[in-house]
């Protein structure tokens, strides 16, 4: 069973629907016991890093997710959920993340040509830095759907894929059982479903 963490951030039911479409057993939950019993965990998220980190901390869900990941359970963060896996974010100040991956989250603005629209919204290509079972069903250059104004950097240890938007931006990361996608698999059509299938098949 896959636990999609419900901590009041993000459209969780489109994600749940995507898992159902590929025949996966997934639930949206904030129940700590259910998260502990799950085989895999999805940490979704949209919005501000500070607010999401606060909700995870105050609900105690952040600690549960972190402990499960440290025990070896497959965990995938999506969009803001991926950013929360890192040590810190510089979104409107400096805020601590879960610290499961080395790196930080910084604004796209100032790092790319000022003529580019921020946030990056829309389809963009994925360029792999290495092979990984998460991407076993997709190909180099396949397109995924992005909506973000911040990106992960200083994350060479976990970098899995980049996308080009004025410069190379982190699109996906993976280190051991912890992984993340900056894009939204649930909004990325067949490519997104194939990525979720790859996640479901991880040991």
Give names to the regions the model predicted.
Residues 88-165:
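Pocket-forming structural segment of enzyme catalytic cores
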């Amino acid at each position: 069973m896959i636990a999609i963490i419900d901590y009041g951030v993000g459209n969780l039911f489109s994600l749940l629907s995507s898992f159902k479409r590929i025949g996966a057993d997934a639930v949206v939950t904030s129940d700590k016991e259910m998260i502990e019993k799950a085989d895999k965990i999805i940490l979704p998220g949209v919005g501000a890093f500070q607010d999401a980190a606060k909700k995870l901390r105050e609900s105690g869900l952040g600690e549960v997710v972190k402990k499960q990941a440290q025990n070896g359970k497959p965990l995938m963060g999506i969009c803001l959920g991926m950013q929360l896996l890192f040590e810190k974010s510089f979104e409107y100040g400096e805020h601590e993340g879960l610290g499961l991956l080395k790196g930080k989250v910084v604004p796209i603005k100032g790092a790319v040509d000022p003529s580019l629209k921020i946030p990056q919204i829309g389809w963009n290509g994925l360029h792999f830095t290495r092979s990984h079972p998460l991407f076993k069903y997709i190909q180099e250059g396949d397109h995924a759907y992005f909506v973000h104004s911040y990106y992960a950097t200083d994350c060479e240890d976990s970098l899995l894929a980049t996308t080009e938007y004025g410069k190379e931006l982190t699109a996906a990361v993976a280190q051991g059982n912890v992984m993340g996608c900056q894009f939204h698999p649930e909004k990325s059509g067949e490519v997104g479903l194939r990525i979720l299938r790859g996640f479901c098949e991880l040991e």
